[in-house]
Amino acid sequence: MYRELISHKIAELKKERKAIILAHNYQLGEIQDAADFVGDSLELARKAAKVDAGVIVFCGVHFMAETAAILSPEKIVLAPEPRAGCPMADMISGAELREFKSRHPGLPVVCYVNSTAEVKAESDICCTSANAVKVVESLKSDTVLFVPDQYLGAFVKERTSKKIISWPGYCPSHARIKPEDIVNLKKHYPAARVIVHPESRPEVTALADEVLSTGQMVSYATRADVKELIVGTEIGMLYRLRKENPDKLFIPVSEQAVCANMKMTTLPKLLASLENMQTVVSVPEEIRVKAVGAVERMLRVV
């Protein structure tokens, strides 16, 4: 009853504020249910760039709300939980990227969207896990710098002819997914397909039937002619997969693959955000104008 009451208040305030609620696939189920749109980083970036609403309430982690603010400076972007950061995004700073570039002069920088606005501003083009291969292939250079995710960089390297020089960052949640977990689960579910996220270690992706972004996982789960899927990504993804495919069995590779930051946003925090119009996320204009080019170039890659 309490949850229904909060959800009703959120829906009312959303109309009053002329707001749209965007949520990442890793958010709590209650947040996904309250959202107008749920998706992966690429889908959310595209949505943020096109929405008519004057207020965007972003339920995710900080870099996602920042990306929305970069793309839509005329809109109010709210983060219900401003402390929700991204450990991988914090593994490289703008200064560190500038030093990295100085050691490899002239090479283009492909920046995973899981990064700060400052790092995006120092990059040539952004990418997400859904379009990383296409983005790298779109560049003329035979060698590219890839930041900050070394495992996504390794995934791209296997699928292109280009030389990838990666920054040694990683996602702690996906790093908890172990190959032996997949091997053990396959013994119990021999008919199951294995789908994993490209932020996983190479020895994990090597055991997968498909390596997919979270948005691609949703599409694959719906169309795949299989009743059992072993899923290697952050545990929040299982909520949407099960909700949209109640006739299928989804087994997490690891219950330890949890992003605590993604779970910080709750219904009461979402309600408070709309009530008080907080917390506004903004990017300094001198950084935004540099970062927006990298993000928009990514969005132009089909």
Curated annotation (Swiss-Prot):
- Primary site of residence: cytoplasm
Q: Listed GO molecular functions?
A: 4 iron, 4 sulfur cluster binding; metal ion binding; quinolinate synthetase A activity
Binding annotation for iminosuccinate: 24, 41, 112-114, 129, 197-199, 214
Which Pfam families is this protein grouped with?
NadA (PF02445)
- Which biological pathway? Cofactor biosynthesis; NAD(+) biosynthesis; quinolinate from iminoaspartate: step 1/1
Name the chemical reaction catalysed here: iminosuccinate + dihydroxyacetone phosphate = quinolinate + phosphate + 2 H2O + H(+)
UniProt keywords, alphabetically: 4Fe-4S, Cytoplasm, Iron, Iron-sulfur, Metal-binding, Pyridine nucleotide biosynthesis, Transferase
* Source organism, top-level taxon: Bacteria
Co-factor binding comment: Binds 1 [4Fe-4S] cluster per subunit.
Reported EC number(s) for this entry are 2.5.1.72
**GO terms of biological process kind:** 'de novo' NAD biosynthetic process from L-aspartate
Question: Per the record's keyword annotation, is Cell inner membrane included, yes or no?
Answer: no
Q: Which cofactor does it need?
A: [4Fe-4S] cluster
- Subcellular locations according to the entry: Cytoplasm
Q: Where does [4Fe-4S] cluster bind?
A: 86, 171, 259
Question: What does the entry list under GO cellular component?
Answer: cytoplasm
The family note in this entry says: Belongs to the quinolinate synthase family. Type 2 subfamily.
The entry's function note states: Catalyzes the condensation of iminoaspartate with dihydroxyacetone phosphate to form quinolinate.
Q: What is this protein called?
A: Quinolinate synthase
Origin organism is Dehalococcoides mccartyi (strain ATCC BAA-2100 / JCM 16839 / KCTC 5957 / BAV1)
Q: Which gene encodes it?
A: nadA
